[in-house]
Every structure is written in C-alpha cells, then in structure tokens.
Curated annotation (Swiss-Prot):
Assembly information from the UniProt record: Monomer.
Protein's UniProt name: Translation initiation factor IF-3
Keywords for the protein's UniProt record, in alphabetical order: Cytoplasm, Initiation factor, Protein biosynthesis
Pfam families, A to Z: IF3_C, IF3_N
GO cellular component: cytosol; membrane
Localisation per UniProt entry: Cytoplasm
Record HAMAP family: IF_3
Record flagged with keyword Cytoplasm: yes
Gene of this entry: infC
Gene Ontology molecular functions: ribosome binding; translation initiation factor activity
Function summary: IF-3 binds to the 30S ribosomal subunit and shifts the equilibrium between 70S ribosomes and their 50S and 30S subunits in favor of the free subunits, thus enhancing the availability of 30S subunits on which protein synthesis initiation begins.
Family label: Belongs to the IF-3 family.
InterPro entries: T_IF-3_C_sf, T_IF-3_N_sf, Translation_initiation_fac3_CS, Translation_initiation_fac_3, Translation_initiation_fac_3_C, Translation_initiation_fac_3_N
Organism name: Pseudomonas fluorescens (strain SBW25)
SUPFAM superfamilies: Translation initiation factor IF3, C-terminal domain, Translation initiation factor IF3, N-terminal domain
Length: 183
C-alpha cells in the first residue's frame, strides 16, 4: 500500500491563516503594524500598505464582516507562537498516579517503608493510589483492610487529602490520595 507523503504532512500541519494574496475578501478591517485601527479599506489598499512597510497582511478573523486583517511579520509571529507553546509545554508538570499495594497482614516495618514512599509521592506532587488486595479467606475480614486504610489516611493527613474514599473493586480495596496544594 502506497501512502503519499504530502497527505501525511497535511494532517500534522496546523491550519494556517490566509496571508497576502491568499485573502479572498474584497474589503477588510485593517489593523496597522503597531496595533492601531486603520479602518475598512479595500484588499488592494491593505496589500499596498503591508508592502510599503515590508510586512505581511495576515487575516486574523475570517468570521467578522468585513474580515479583520493585520499588518505584521508573519514568520516572526509564527516563531513567537511556537516559542510560547514550547515554554508552556516545558512548564507543565505531568501529574502521575503512583500505586502502593498493601495486604491485610502487612507488618509494621513494611508499613513504614510503604508509608515513606507514599509521603515521597505526595511531596513530589503526584497522586497516590493505595490498594489492598485480599486473597482467599481474607475476604471474610474486610474490616481489617478498612482499618489499615483508615490508618494510612490518618498518617498522611498532613501530606494529602483523600480524593477517593476506600471502596471494594473485586478483591481489592482502593483509595486515592491527592497531594495538598502548595502555597
């Protein structure tokens, strides 16, 4: 099967605003390079003004009547937008859900290790999913699991708050804890 290269690139490319001669309207509301309103002018006049200032005429709002166009350096504005998107992406933190698994018979030493890991996850700003798995006859003693999750909740009170209270899903008791907001 042959796939044309142009078709794949078109899907990835963002829709571009019409510029210069590609603007189809006869009249446009023109905004100057410095942001001032010039008014409603013919497309030929707008192109002439853009050409005199050695900039591009870019259609900002095609929905308006007449369409709004601005005199600007199109390449520079695209570059600035890409830079802003990259900066926003860089500053964005991906919140993950980390999971710690307990058992009804989890001993004190193991409990403390798992609790330390939960504290670390919440301090890093990640949500924590605490699951407690019952095997075999342990299902008859679900109250022990509930007590263990209540203890975890009490121990993590200063680091986070319960987002999803303990509930049974099959043979597991699951609780989700969200980190406290930083001031």
């Amino acid at each position: 099967m042959i796939i044309k290269r142009e078709m794949r690139q078109d899907k990835r490319a963002a829709p571009k605003a019409p510029i210069n001669e590609n603007i189809s309207a006869r009249e446009v509301r023109l905004i100057g390079a410095d942001g001032e309103q010039i008014g409603i002018v013919s497309i030929d006049e707008a192109l002439r003004i853009a050409e005199e200032s050695k900039l591009d005429l870019v259609e900002i709002s095609a929905d308006a009547i007449p369409p709004v166009c601005r005199v600007m350096d199109y390449g520079k504005s695209i570059f600035e937008k890409k830079k802003q998107v990259a900066a926003a992406k860089k500053n964005q933190k991906q919140i993950q859900v980390k999971e710690i698994k307990f058992r009804p018979g989890t001993e004190e030493g193991d409990y403390q290790v798992k609790l330390r890991n939960l504290v670390r996850f919440l301090s890093d700003g990640d949500r924590a999913k605490v699951s407690l798995r019952f095997r075999g006859r342990e299902m008859a003693h679900q109250e022990l699991g509930m007590e263990l999750l209540k203890r975890v909740e009490a121990d993590l009170l200063e680091y986070g708050s319960v987002e999803q209270h303990p509930k049974m899903e099959g043979r597991q008791l699951i609780m989700v804890i969200a980190p406290k907001k930083k001031k």
